[in-house]
């Protein structure tokens, strides 16, 4: 184990292989157990907490997902992946105003800044974070009942999609959200 609860470079390959295998086999409960163990061993690494949040979301354990995401954010609030995942967890619990504060933080910075920040992983990764944050902004507006703003965000997300740029959201999901904006029942009728 690295000093002070940090992961050492030579340990990452073994851990990455284990994570990839468990994800590929959709062994979400085993993956959760593995990540809990890693988060205790490497208690200063926000990565494991962020991954735990994602797994808990998959398992529909939204309160737990939020707790892991919050802890990751407390450890490393400058990491844009941590911020993005925290937004996701907050929106899942309808903590809309808290989520919007972080959405605005990501919107304010350039893609280049995100790409080459301390925890940045390059331009494609940063474009993915920025565009998927636009989708989450749409979710925020949809939950607030601001349908025109929500539709605009989802449409921009769709327009900004590019081959080779990963998204957490399928095109089908985005189109469904746009349709939801168009056919959302009016609060007065």
Model features per residue range: what roles?
Residues 17, 51, 85, 129-136, ...:
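"A position-specific structural signal for the A-helix of alpha-solenoid helical repeats
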């Amino acid at each position: 184990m690295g000093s002070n609860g940090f992961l050492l470079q030579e340990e990452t390959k073994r851990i990455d292989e284990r994570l990839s295998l468990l994800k590929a086999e959709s062994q979400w409960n085993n993956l959760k157990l593995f990540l809990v163990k890693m988060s205790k061993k490497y208690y200063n690494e926000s990565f494991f907490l962020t991954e735990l949040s994602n797994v808990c979301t998959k398992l529909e354990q939204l309160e737990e997902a939020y707790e892991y995401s919050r802890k990751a954010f407390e450890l490393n609030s400058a990491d844009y992946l941590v911020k993005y995942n925290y937004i996701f967890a907050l929106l899942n619990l309808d903590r809309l105003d808290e989520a919007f504060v972080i959405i605005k933080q990501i919107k304010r910075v350039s893609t280049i800044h995100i790409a080459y920040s301390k925890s940045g992983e390059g331009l494609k990764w940063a474009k993915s974070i920025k565009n998927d944050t636009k989708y989450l902004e749409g979710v925020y507006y949809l939950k607030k009942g601001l349908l025109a703003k929500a539709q605009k965000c989802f449409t921009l997300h769709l327009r900004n999609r590019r081959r080779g740029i990963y998204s957490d959201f399928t095109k089908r999901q985005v189109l469904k959200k746009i349709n939801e904006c168009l056919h959302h029942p009016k609060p007065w009728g």
